[in-house]
């Protein structure tokens, strides 16, 4: 089965996108007077269990800090925590302090998968056709053929393999080395396979010509081609949790996995 985006990959992206955090804190420690350099008066009894402003015997300029974004961390036991990130924009207010005291166990967050289009603003540049006039067979050895409506595809057992739909595969270039974006066009036609929502049939979308540049808004005709042995998977670029799939008595559609079959053989 092809791999799908997991939580820890999302966390790695989160940290890599915010790697300037540590350098910002280092800069702060070198250029600001230490918070602990100042001496403070003991608290009176009537200040216990309250949020108070600490008075200092020295006059110092407090660094301007604000809560800006969340930094996600995972403990050794697998517990996911949310910690606040500091930046040099606005001063901390008493409201912020009150929030911290009243909510000491702030923000245990649930694992979630970030949508692909949220993480990236991708552009895909056309390179060339890498496969021509090939057929796709599913795990039941059924070939993909055009439905009677001519708008959809379906899987069917064929005696004459010449009746199977033949595809051309165009490959696109992107900055991501770990993915191989491709289009599936019915050979000698302007019809491209177009991904839809989960459990919805894929459409045959007419394009006047092969797109030279594809952006996120047009990524329904783009798929990430993955292989495992002789099995081939086509993951939607518009929704990477969905694959081109077949199921008995159903049109070719988009699915996450079983009971639909998402692997194909190319011949």
UniProtKB/Swiss-Prot annotation:
Acetylated within its nuclear localization sequence, which impacts subcellular localization. Residues 82-86 are annotated as: Nuclear localization signal (NLS). Pfam families: IL1, IL1_propep. It comes from the Eukaryota. It is found in: Nucleus; Cytoplasm; Secreted. GO terms for biological process: cellular response to heat; cellular response to lipopolysaccharide; connective tissue replacement involved in inflammatory response wound healing; cytokine-mediated signaling pathway; ectopic germ cell programmed cell death; extrinsic apoptotic signaling pathway in absence of ligand; fever generation; immune response. Belongs to the IL-1 family. This is Interleukin-1 alpha. It comes from Oryctolagus cuniculus (Rabbit). The lineage of its organism: Eukaryota, Metazoa, Chordata, Craniata, Vertebrata. The gene is IL1A.
